[in-house]
Structures are given as structure tokens and as C-alpha cells.
């Protein structure tokens, strides 16, 4: 067998490397590696040479069959060396936007692969000559049944559902390819960064596997230095957005399953040793309980982690406006931390103060804009910078303002957040998954507090270890990406999940993990009201022992009579702040009628009037995030002429037109 043939079968190469010493003659024949080997003693000699490390062979007598075995062994060893070079997934790098990057956004060629012909053979086994090879015919008779360069293009970042009408409902595999010129810089390494790919992504560079990632809303990156070459290169991504019971989110959810590379793609240039992540916050108090940043401490805490456990590396922190220029040295684990005296102006919705920050290590300088604030609870109050605050919020899906498609830019974020500002909001719930980094940063600049959430939504596979690992990975990635955003005050771990011991064990582990990663923010989740007797609601949920803020969704007026709202009483047996994380009802913009006629603007308007009056009677109410800012696409909403695959609970239509209920909520917030 030639080296060229073995190159086409990496699984076989790996088998050879691992099993050569244990293979029998029958094994060689069965695997089709070498045929007609005569004289088992000659084979044993080859194996003995490996044990004795006597390669090249030193014994004199060589037969034709032994020489064949030598050639095979040479091939194995050579391919072993080749296969060790490649790409590796590396931990998420904090603040991509503040580093040296090259954008790969723009037009990507795509091929729709309904039966995954480009990945599996006809026996459903992965094979080594899939679409990721980007193969071209070398002779007139060569059979290659795909061609990226002749395929159509779509924009990245972007979803395929709204860029190709044939793919509006499509859930499956699409291959995307981008060619680009690259010239390596001496002494630097290159990471390939994706802001998000929904949902299952296999990534290839120049025909070789860079890595695999699962999860549709958080960033990931690979070190692809050894896969890139000087000159023309290409990246191919196999994207699959099919839904599965063990996924997070699971098979059913009430939003559009936008497939594709939905956020930025960048090449990131780094030094061999670089700052992987860092955190800046106000100094922690030393009171009882979990440490929280303290307004009166007069200190700033800085910590940083290198990509390698390298001691003695110098990291410099500079905040010019605060006259900070301080060096700190890493320990044996590659981390460094320091507490500095400083009294920055505190970030708030009224004064969203941000400071320019520079972090230098070696030849690399990272820039950021960071604010400082405190967030804590006291009894049933939420305190921002030591003062009680009422969170005047709204829930938002990550969907463009102009009719649909996944939002993916600062401009998209600014439009949606401006609508929330016009409503009188100081708070947004980014539902039901981590939104793109542009949205969080734009909210910070605009003075908008943020609730950020992972998609543990409805019916998760609570007892599946892989499902938990997936959820924890998404939680970790969300926190690592946004841990320096002053406006993020709540990490949410779930939405509307059914009560069970298995669910409690799953979610309490997530809450614990969130606190381990970041004890400077509040933990919550959107619960359901499950204990109701006539007009008395009692919020009973074991998870309330694990959260800092009790949050629940209720739809009085939509899933029960709107007139019941005035009769409702609420019992929340916890000395914790309360957020009503969802309420509302649907209306189609421009449809008018009596206030008891469902789907009219008047029905929604009256529902908001009755609900806001009811909310005023809830003891300990610290905020609310009604459902939802704008109408959004959902395959579950099929009522022709009304829903047309839109959830109509928005205060704006999908085109940005205000419904009557907008003014009810705006006026109510003006009193808070």
C-alpha cells in the first residue's frame, strides 16, 4: 500500500499506529493492509524491531516480504508524524474586538447537503474525501460531484433561512467555504474565531480538520497556525442545525431555528504566550456571605490568565483616566492578580461611564472599555451602586428590526435598544440565549442593564451527562465573554422548566458553577407559577433556594381571563427581590376591534392595563421584563392571516410599528 493511499484513510492510519504491535497475520489480511505475507516470523521480526527500537532494521537477511513490511512501517511512522500536526481548540479568548484581527466576514459559497453526502459514505460512515477537501478534477475522467467555486454565496455573519427562500424552513446540513489570502507573521500564532455557529459545526482549514463545536450562541476558537500557509487558503464549515432531544435547547422551542454562521468570523493574531482572559472589577467587600464588589472600598481588582502556565511573565495594566500604570508578574500557573487604589466614577443607566483600558503582555496590547459598578440584593430590593433600583425592562429576541433574520451587528443592536429606550427601559432581558457581543456592548454604552441567559428552555434532558456538560459549557462561555461588561447584572440559568428532582439537581449545579466563575453578579431563572388556587398564586419552586432574585413568568389575560388580573393575590415566601420576567399577549399591528376581541391592538392594550395594575400589588416587585419588544418568527405560530409564523406578543410589529400597548407600558414606567 502506498503512502498516497494511506493518506486517504486517516482512520486506518490511526489504527495502524495504535495496533501495529498487537496485530496478527490474520489482522493484516482482514484490514487489507498487506496481502500475501509469507512467513509469520518475518512479521514478528518487524514487531521486535519496534520493541528494541532498532529501526532502521539491523539484521542482515532481508526477503521480499520483509522489505514490504519495512516500507509499510516507514509509511506508518511518517504518517504518524504528519497526523500529529494540526489544529487544536483553545479556551475562549476574552475581548476579540480589542485584539489584532482579520475579518473573514462577507460572501461565502454554500452547498446544501440534505443527506450529508459530503460527510458520510453510502454506509453512513465518515470518509476522508468529503466536501471539506474542496477537491478539483485533475483529469478529464475524474468524478467530483460538487464545486464550491460555482456554488451560490450568502453573507456571513448571517442565517441561511432569510438569505435563500428555499431554506426558510430548512433544518439540516449546509457547507460554507471562504477563500482568503494569508501571510504569516514570524513569531506569532493564529487563532480562527467564530462568534457563533448554529448549531453543530465541523471546521476545516485547507482540507484538514481544525475542530468541532456544539452550541449555537457562544464563541469558540481554534489554533490553526499549523494548518495555514503563505498565500491562498480556504476555510470550510459544515453547519448542522437539526434539533435533538439531548441538545441545549432541546427539540422544541418558541423561536426560529436560524441556521448558519450567524456571528463574526475572524483570524486572531497572537504571540505564542498571550493573555487568554482577564477581569476588572471594584474591590470586594469583606463582609459575611459571598463577596461582592464594594462601592466604598476605593480599590480595583485586576486578574489575568495566560494561555500557558508560564511564571515570571510581566503584564501591564493601564487606565490613563485613573492614572493607573501598573505591572504584575504571573505565577507558576500563568495567572496574575493585583488590587489597586482607585475611585472611578460608577457606571449607571443615567451615567454609563466607561474607561479606556490597556493590557500589555510582551509585544501585544489589548484595548477595552470597562465600567465599574456594584450590584447586590438587600431583602426584597436590588441595589445598584448601593441604591435601590426598579428594573424597567423588556425581553428581546436576537432578531433584526426590519422583519426577521438573526441580528448580528452594532447597528441591529442599536435599533432594538433605541426602541427599548423609547419605551422608558433601563433594563433588557436578552432571551433565551446569549446574544451577540455587539448587543451587550451597545447596551452598556447606552446605559442599559442586562439579564443574560442560556437556553435551558422547557424540557431539557436533565439526567443526560452530555446535556449537562453542554449547558455548563454555554454558561461558562457566556460568563467568560461578558465578565467585564458593567451592565450585565444577572446570569440566568433557565426558562420555564418543569419541576422535578432531576431538574433541581441539574440547575443547582449550574447556579453553583456560575458563582464559582463570577460571584460579582446575581443569579436568577425564569420560573413558572405552578401553585394557584382560584385567585391566589403562591410561587413554590425548590430553585428559589439557589437564586438571588426570584423571577417568574405569568400570562394572566392571555392564557386565562384578563378580568382575573384585578382579583389576583400573590404569595412569594422568600425574602428576595421579585422580577416578573414575562407577561403579555398577542396582537397583530393594525387589527382593531373591541377590547375583548383577541388579536386586536385594543385587546393587548387592555391586557397591559390590567396587568400593570396587578403588578403594583406584588410585594417586593423589583422589576419586570414583559414579553416582548417586537414580533419575532416562530414555527409554532401558524394561524394564517394573524400569526403567519410570527409570535405576535411584541409591542412593535416585525417592521417596527408601535402597537397601542407600547404607550400603556411607557406611561407605567414613567411612574417608576
Question: Predicted regions span which residues?
Answer:
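Short, positively charged and aromatic/hydrophobic N-terminal segments
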Residues: 6, 11-14, 22-25, 33-36, ...
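Short Gly/Ser/Thr- and charged-rich N-terminal loops/segments
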Residues: 27-32, 285-295
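Hydrophobic h-region of N-terminal signal peptides that target proteins for export
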Residues: 78-86
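Accessory beta-strand-rich segments of carbohydrate-active enzymes
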Residues: 90, 94-95, 111-115, 166-275, ...
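Active-site-adjacent substrate/metal-binding segments within catalytic domains
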Residues: 141-143, 152-181, 186-205, 211-212, ...
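Extended acidic/polar, glycine-enriched regions
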Residues: 229-232, 303-378
